[in-house]
Design a protein with these regions (language model features):
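Glycine-enriched loop-and-adjacent helix/strand subsegments that border the catalytic/binding cleft
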Residues: 1-111, 139-140, 144, 149
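Active-site pocket scaffolds in enzymes
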Residues: 119-155
């Protein structure tokens, strides 16, 4: 079993074929998520073409969601520019910067809306918040830690 610390957004209604800009305009709330993964089940599921059905048994969300204005200057270019702290068995293991997402939330939402209407209340996740390694004297280190166990094992 693995955890994945993520940022998520809750959308309003959006029509199929929406642009990334329209995706950003549809964001109503921001919250945190722990996207649970059963890593040993995922390879077989993907090989069968079923996707992440049994390998993703549950997702837990923060008890509070905030509007974009509550984030102030931390909300820029469709990304949350804050650190996300991850703990594992009560021990802090990650303090990763959420800003360097490969795709901003508008792009993620537009991708979702490519083949369907997106209804109010839809939740879109950032994927695991992860930061790149820093090389010092030929050795790679991850000063911000990690946001999932699989990432730690890959270090």
């Amino acid at each position: 079993i693995d955890f994945e610390s993520e940022i998520t957004v809750v959308t309003g209604d959006l029509t199929m074929g929406a642009t990334p800009e329209q995706g950003l305009e549809a964001i109503r709330l921001v919250m945190l998520a722990n996207d649970v993964s059963l890593r040993r089940l995922i390879p077989d599921e993907l090989a069968k073409g079923f996707g992440f059905l049994q390998g993703k048994p549950a997702t837990a969300f923060s008890p509070v969601a905030v509007t974009l204005d509550e984030l102030g200057s931390a909300w820029q270019d469709g990304r949350v520019h804050l650190k996300l702290q991850s703990t594992w068995n009560g021990r802090r293991v990650g303090h990763c910067d959420a800003a360097p997402m490969t795709f901003h939330f508008g792009q993620l939402i537009a991708h979702l809306a490519k083949t369907r209407n997106v209804r109010a209340g839809s939740i879109v996740g950032s994927g695991t918040v992860s930061n790149q390694a820093v090389e010092q004297q030929g050795v790679k280190t991850w000063p911000n830690g990690y946001s999932c166990i699989a990432e730690k094992r890959a270090m």
